[in-house]
Each structure stands twice: as structure tokens, then as C-alpha cells.
């Protein structure tokens, strides 16, 4: 079912899915209203071993391809989406947004090719497509419209600075404009998954200055750190998002590296957890 009115205020809660009781963070009220399932996975519930243990979803980190494919399948099975085609981009810390506006096999092949060429956000304007992006400290962002359209973005500090999530929201709003008007983004729910928090994100003075110049002093908590969530939220507000509709998981990946992958905590060798969104066709 797709909502025609206002979405419920976003809330991120922990749940276990499927026969394997796979843990993930989600919003059940959103799913009940729109049919859109959003999920932030952790590192438990998969088959990978060593530094990738166990639910590694990234195929670019040194884990075995068969393990990654099995882990991705386990996630879709647990979320009751085993039959939903999956699109996973090659993330490049850029600002390219790939729009998924046709679920036909030919269009999906073209979209996958575009995503594999390098993209850090996917915008799905039709049902029947699942989007997965992978993370280990960077900021996962999922935006959902009352129409059931959605966007998933990967924002490292460069992506936050360059506004990749805001760019995805603007693309989503263009798709919604005929139904929801020019201020469509004001009614979107935004979900921010586990990421490196300000207390663990120490940067050089040059990066702090760039963030302060771009987003204001609210994202600079002290003379050593940058608050990526605050900077991201400022950028999303510029794209029309209501700050009251931005829900943060409240989890720092560095501090919680036993539950989520953290590049910084692991010293560079680790798996990737995921941000997943889909709406089934029919």
C-alpha cells in the first residue's frame, strides 16, 4: 500500500527478520503505511569470516565473492524480498545519482551498468527494485516519499560536503512534483543509519574550516572534530527536508564496532554493513 497523506514521524527501531533472526534497524510504521521497507544491517547473521565476519555486503574489500553474494541473498530473504531485483553501485565517494525509473529487465541492466560505473546514490521511482549501498563509518541515508518512491545515499565526509544526499533528495522531489508539488521534499522521511559520530571523527583544521564555511559552526563541536550528521542535516534542509523528519539511529560505528563495521576502528581491513530499501511491485 502506498500512502497518499502525511507519513508517520520517522522512528528507527531494532528488529530481527526471517528464520535466521537477522538483526537490522528499521521503521515498521513506514512499511505499514507505504510498503517501503528500509533497513540498516549490522555485522551479525552472515557467512563471512575473519575481519569480514559475518554479514559483509561489500564485494570490494577482499572478502570472497561467494560469501558476499550469499550474505546479500540472506538479507533479501530475511526481509521477504528474495524475488526483488537488487541494484548495488560501485561507490566512489562522489556525487553521481542513478535514477531507477523502470523495473523491466532491460532497464535494470542499464541501471546496473550505470551504477557500476560509479555512483553514491540510487533513486527508485518505481516499485519492484531493491537498492543496497555499503558502509563502514560513512553516513547511510535513506529518504522516503509518501508516494513510495525512495532514495538511498552513501555520504562519506566528501559526500556530505558535496551534498550527494541532498542531490538524491532533489531528484526524488522532481519525480514527485506532479503529485506532491514543488515542496514535495518537505514531507519526506529521512533515515540516517549508524556512522562515525563527531566524538570519533577527528579531522585536520583544513577539513573543519571547509565544513564550517559550508554548513556553519553548528557542525564544529570543538577544535578537533566535525559532526557529519549536523552538516548532512543542514544540507538536507537546503534541499527542502524538514529537520523534524530526520531520524538518526544514534549509533557510532567506531564505538560499536562489535555490532557494525568500522574502517577506522579496524585499521582499514573490515567488511561493510548495508542500507537497504525496496518496495515490492503489485
Explain the meaning of each model-derived region:
Residues 1-282:
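Active-site microenvironment for binding and transforming phosphate-containing groups
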Amino acid at each position: 500500500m502506498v500512502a497518499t497523506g502525511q507519513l508517520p514521524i520517522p522512528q528507527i527501531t531494532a528488529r530481527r527478520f526471517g528464520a535466521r533472526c537477522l538483526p537490522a534497524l528499521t521503521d515498521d510504521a513506514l512499511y505499514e503505511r507505504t510498503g517501503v521497507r528500509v533497513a540498516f544491517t549490522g555485522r551479525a547473521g552472515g557467512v563471512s569470516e575473519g575481519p569480514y565476519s559475518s554479514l559483509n555486503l561489500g564485494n570490494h574489500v577482499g572478502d570472497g565473492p561467494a560469501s558476499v553474494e550469499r550474505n546479500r541473498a540472506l538479507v533479501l530473504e530475511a526481509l521477504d524480498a528474495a524475488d526483488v531485483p537488487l541494484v548495488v553501485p560501485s561507490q566512489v565517494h562522489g556525487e553521481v545519482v542513478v535514477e531507477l525509473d523502470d523495473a523491466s529487465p532491460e532497464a535494470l541492466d542499464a541501471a546496473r551498468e550505470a551504477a557500476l560505473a560509479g555512483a553514491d546514490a540510487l533513486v527508485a521511482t518505481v516499485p519492484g527494485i531493491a537498492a543496497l549501498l555499503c558502509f563502514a563509518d560513512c553516513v547511510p541515508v535513506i529518504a522516503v516519499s509518501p508516494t513510495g518512491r525512495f532514495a538511498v545515499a552513501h555520504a562519506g565526509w566528501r559526500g556530505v560536503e558535496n551534498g550527494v544526499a541532498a542531490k538524491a533528495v532533489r531528484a526524488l522531489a522532481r519525480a514527485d512534483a506532479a503529485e506532491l508539488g514543488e515542496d514535495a521534499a518537505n514531507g519526506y522521511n529521512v533515515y540516517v543509519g549508524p556512522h562515525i559520530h563527531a566524538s570519533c571523527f577527528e579531522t585536520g583544521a583544513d577539513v573543519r574550516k571547509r565544513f564550517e564555511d559550508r554548513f556553519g559552526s553548528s557542525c564544529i563541536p570543538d577544535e578537533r572534530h566535525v559532526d557529519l550528521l549536523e552538516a548532512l542535516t543542514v544540507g538536507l534542509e537546503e534541499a527542502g527536508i524538514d529537520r523534524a523528519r530526520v531520524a538518526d539511529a544514534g549509533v557510532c560505528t567506531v564505538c560499536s564496532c562489535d555490532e557494525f563495521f568500522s574502517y577506522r576502528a579496524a585499521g582499514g581491513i573490515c567488511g561493510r554493513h548495508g542500507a537497504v530499501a525496496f518496495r515490492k511491485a503489485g
